[in-house]
Design a protein with these regions (language model features):
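Short, positively charged, Gly/Tyr-enriched micro-motifs
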Residues: 63, 70-150
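Helix-boundary capping/turn motifs
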Residues: 3-9, 68-69, 100-101
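Generic preference for well-ordered secondary structure
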Residues: 2, 6, 14-18, 50, ...
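General helical secondary-structure elements
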Residues: 41, 120-122, 193
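Generic structural signal for short, flexible, solvent-exposed coil/loop and linker residues
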Residues: 7, 11, 20, 53-55, ...
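Long C-terminal interaction/binding lobes of large macromolecular proteins
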Residues: 1-12, 23, 27, 127-128, ...
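N-terminal juxtadomain amphipathic helix
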Residues: 15-66
């Protein structure tokens, strides 16, 4: 299942450019809370499992801050490189957990050697994918766009298998695109039940 292209600079440049495009569109749409102008407020993250990535590709999180007085809220767009607040890169979380779903021990050991992911971490990821992810608002809505039901006990491998492509790189990219809204805090309904303004 593992493909060396996963660690290629070409693959990670593709992810970075996609995030750049999302960020540009987010800024053009203005603040989703008040409609104010957004100013660049990028910040650095230091995710693990960034094999093959250059510093900027791995660490730069595109983000904006509203310039309108009285709002000043942060707007962080969706991302294919980051999966919410998880310490490891989104690609690593998806791929390594999918390996574990298949019990492909040799492949998993190879991934662990590359990314330094311990067994306990992988087990936590499996629990998240199979017990918590299916209960998210995102999945409740997004699974309706899939042509056939996904076997949730095999997530994320079953989701990765759903997307077609010539190699693992293209299938993984399609999966990460599908999951982008998991990394968009402002998209989620807040604890008071209020949704951000959409323009």
């Amino acid at each position: 299942m593992f493909d060396s292209s996963f660690g290629s600079s070409k693959f990670h440049k593709l992810l970075f450019r996609f995030d750049q495009d999302i960020a540009s569109k987010t800024r053009a749409d203005k603040c989703p809370y008040c409609g104010g102008k957004l100013h660049v407020g990028n910040y650095l993250r230091h995710p693990r499992g960034t094999y093959g990535m250059e510093h900027e590709q791995a660490n730069l999180r595109f983000s904006f801050c509203c310039g309108r007085e009285g709002c000043r809220r942060r707007v962080t767009p969706p991302s294919v490189r980051f999966l919410g607040r998880k310490v490891y890169s989104g690609a690593t979380v998806v791929l390594v957990t999918a390996m574990r779903c298949r019990d492909a021990k040799q492949a998993l050991n190879r991934i662990k050697a590359l990314f330094g992911v311990g067994n306990r971490t992988v087990q936590r990821w499996r629990i998240w994918w199979q017990q918590y992810f299916p209960k998210t608002i995102f999945w409740t809505i997004a699974k309706g766009y899939l042509s056939e039901p996904i076997q949730e006990t095999s997530l994320p491998a079953s989701l990765l298998d759903r997307f077609q492509g010539a190699n693992l790189e293209s299938r993984l990219f399609a999966t990460l695109r599908f999951l982008t809204m998991l990394s968009a805090p402002y998209f989620k309904i807040n604890h008071r039940g209020a949704s951000p303004r959409r323009t």
